[in-house]
């Protein structure tokens, strides 16, 4: 499997090129931006920056076509769950971030196949929220909230055709 991974990376032209790893730290209320540089068969990791947030970010996803990251907390007051849109430079380094609010804390975020909406599911209450994205990729107020009466939603997945949404519920469901 690792040979296949290296083969794919070399065909994509990524082998040997530095890249960034992004990780929210809920304990420090920061976004860690780590520069990863391939060195032969190893990987050199160095903290490029720690971005301070006003909230405990736990969940992160990237926009597939824009240099944006979406970070959210897993809990908070309904309609005021803190999150942020992180703007990146072309090289993947940090530019700025904008605080936003979500309806519910999310344990998983996904974008629809047209990259026009971000979908979030809550582990705590099981709800799905769908937020429209404006031209810059900033989420607006939720246009749909679905509550099936089940808790512990694990993730929200969409097939390539985008015609369905799959939300597995865990534990007692």
Name the predicted role of every residue range.
Residues 2-11:
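Bacterial N-terminal signal peptides
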């Amino acid at each position: 499997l690792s040979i296949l991974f290296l083969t794919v990376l070399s065909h994509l032209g990524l082998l040997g090129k530095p890249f960034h790893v992004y990780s929210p730290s809920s304990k420090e209320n920061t976004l860690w931006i780590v520069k990863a540089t391939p060195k032969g068969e190893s990987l050199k990791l160095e903290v490029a920056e720690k971005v301070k947030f006003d909230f405990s970010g736990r969940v992160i996803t990237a926009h597939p076509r824009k240099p944006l990251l979406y970070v959210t907390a897993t809990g908070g007051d309904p309609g005021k769950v803190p999150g942020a849109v992180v703007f990146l430079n072309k090289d993947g380094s940090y530019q700025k971030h904008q605080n936003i609010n979500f309806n519910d804390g999310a344990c998983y975020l996904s974008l629809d196949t047209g990259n026009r909406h971000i979908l979030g599911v809550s582990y705590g209450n099981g709800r799905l929220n769908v937020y429209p994205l404006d031209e810059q990729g900033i989420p607006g107020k939720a246009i749909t909230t679905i509550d099936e009466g089940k808790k512990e939603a694990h993730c929200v997945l969409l097939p390539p055709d985008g015609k369905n949404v799959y939300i597995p519920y865990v534990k007692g469901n």
